[in-house]
Amino acid sequence: MASLGRQVPEWHRLLALSWACLVRQTPHLREQKQMSPSLSCKLTTVPGRGSFQEFSSITPQKYMQEPENRTRLVQCLHEEQKPCVDPESLEPEKVIRSLQDMGFAEAHIHSLFSIQPSVHPQQLLGIVSELLLLGLNPEPVFNALKKNPQLLKLSSMQMKRRSSYLRKLGLGEGKLKRVLSVCPEVFTMHQRDIDRVVKVLREKCLFTAQHITDVLHRCPTVLQEDPNELEYKFQYAYFRMGLTHLDIVRTNFLQYSITKIKQRHIYLERLGRYQTPDKKGQTQIPNPSLRNILRVSEAEFLARTACSSVEEFQVFKKLLDQEEEEESESHASEEEEEEEEEEELL
């Protein structure tokens, strides 16, 4: 009986402490604390000498003098009330650490997450990893994603399939690296559009497999061109300017617009500074190199190649536009006449 009496105060203190901790963390229980008779009544215990003694109800302030028991109980309460951590909330942190390990700067990492906010962090990490496997450094990868944010919406499998297809065209890791840097849209284009361009280069322009590889490596934007316009550009170079397949490939001829090509070529032709080679590839005058025709600024072209003024070239371009417009209208009227004749025959 005496031992039971000694255990009662300890039990009473623990009960009071538990209630006090809960009241502090849960405000709406304070009113219940005031109304609870079990914590406000006096306890009667039996001391060691056998006489009864009354103990007042133990308040939280009194129990604060028991540091060891208080610390143990508070730790238990905190462990029970500790919220669960969602594993998905930790994924951005893991992705950030992975990007840092790959060599990305903090500013680039922040920008990567803002390029496509709706993209899952793990998907972003997968695309970045695939691009790095192509041989790119973090800086070119960041620039490619910034230039074409749609890359982040691809799956890793789609990236692998497109990379595999481009490798079949002869674009290995080194060449594929340049293609992605210059024209990242290659990875998000429809497969049929790429096939059409490759078909024109092979069947209409009669480029060899090696020529096609070199064209795509040197001028990746060719893949974005309309196949019919690409064919016309080749025909103009081959028949009007007398260029060979090798000339077209080595000078990156197909990357220039047909408007720029015609303006500068025809202008030189009318000035007597360019002549179409004969079947043997010979001319009566030395033609300027394609580099000095197309790969220079307009000011340098006029000063060094055409030896003409800006005003004269501007007037020529306006006249050339009128000629092409009239030619187009004439061609359209001829087609209408042919259609009418066919209808009359039917």
Swiss-Prot record:
InterPro entries: MTERF (IPR003690), MTERF_sf (IPR038538)
Chain residue ranges for the region called Disordered: 321-346
Tissue specificity remark: Widely expressed, with highest levels in liver, followed by testis, kidney and brain.
Disulfide linkage: none
Transit peptide: first to last position: 1-42
Gene Ontology BP annotations: camera-type eye development; heart development; mitochondrial transcription; protein targeting to mitochondrion; regulation of DNA-templated transcription; ribosome assembly; rRNA processing
Disruption phenotype annotation: Ablation of the gene is not viable. At 8.5 dpc, mutant homozygous embryos exhibit much reduced size, lack of heart and no optic disks. Conditional knockout in heart leads to severe mitochondrial cardiomyopathy. Premature death occurs at about 21 weeks and decreased body weight is observed from 15 weeks until death.
Acidic residues bias spans: 322-346
Ranges: MTERF repeats: 142-172, 177-204, 209-239, 245-270, 290-318
Domain of life: Eukaryota
Residue segments, region Dimerization with NSUN4: 310-327
Keywords (A to Z) from UniProt: Mitochondrion, Repeat, RNA-binding, rRNA processing, Transit peptide
Subcellular location: Mitochondrion
Molecular function via GO: double-stranded DNA binding; rRNA binding
GO CC terms in record: cytosol; mitochondrial large ribosomal subunit; mitochondrion
Similarity remark: Belongs to the mTERF family.
Subunit structure: Heterodimer with NSUN4; this interaction may be required for NSUN4 recruitment to the mitochondrial large ribosomal subunit.
Written domain comment of the UniProt record: The MTERF repeats form a half-donut shaped, right-handed superhelix, where the concave side displays a positively charged path for nucleic acid interaction.
Protein role: Regulator of mitochondrial ribosome biogenesis and translation. Binds to mitochondrial ribosomal RNAs 16S, 12S and 7S. Targets NSUN4 RNA methyltransferase to the mitochondrial large ribosomal subunit.
Entry protein name: Transcription termination factor 4, mitochondrial
Organism whose genome encodes this protein: Mus musculus (Mouse)
Gene: Mterf4
